[in-house]
């Protein structure tokens, strides 16, 4: 069930790519949803850090293969951000607003991490201010809207998993 949901969210991320970029006047705005990343981060809280790390590796590899630019960037990034989430959540345990803030901040930082790596390698030429104004913040707003949906999916998935586990 978890794997299937992660596949659906990854497909949703790729599907949103068809709608981005869009033009607003003379500006081209990019929105990059990170539903899969938010799901994996929330899994580290509501399901298990080990399972979340496993999914980060598997789906990081799939995204690396799909993008085909630099192998390992997404895999390493997802695993690292799962550990950041696990560390941060110890501080903000059971506080929804703080958890949402941490997940959205880590999602923004993950996107900035990908941008930085690609920028260093010369694969992206977008200046930093343009990145923040035309991609970073619009993506953050989109991900904030999608967070509620991903949060509900994560809660439902964790309940299904707990119901399927044998009771001792």
Predicted regions and their residues:
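Terminal, non-globular segments
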Residues: 1-168
């Amino acid at each position: 069930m978890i794997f299937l949901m992660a596949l659906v969210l990854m497909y949703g991320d790729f599907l949103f790519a068809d709608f981005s970029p869009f033009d607003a006047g003379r500006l081209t705005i990019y929105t990059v949803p990170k539903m899969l990343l938010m799901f994996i981060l929330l899994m580290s809280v509501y399901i298990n850090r080990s399972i979340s790390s496993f999914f980060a590796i598997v789906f990081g590899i799939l995204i690396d293969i799909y993008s085909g630019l630099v192998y390992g960037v997404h895999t390493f990034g997802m695993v690292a951000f799962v550990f950041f989430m696990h560390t941060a959540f110890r501080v903000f345990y059971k506080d929804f607003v703080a958890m949402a803030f941490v997940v959205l901040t880590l999602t923004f930082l993950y996107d900035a991490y990908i941008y930085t790596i690609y920028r260093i390698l010369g694969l992206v030429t977008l200046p930093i201010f343009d990145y923040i104004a035309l991609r970073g913040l619009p993506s953050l707003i989109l991900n904030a809207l999608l967070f509620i949906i991903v949060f509900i999916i994560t809660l439902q998935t964790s309940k299904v998993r707990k119901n399927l586990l044998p009771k001792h």
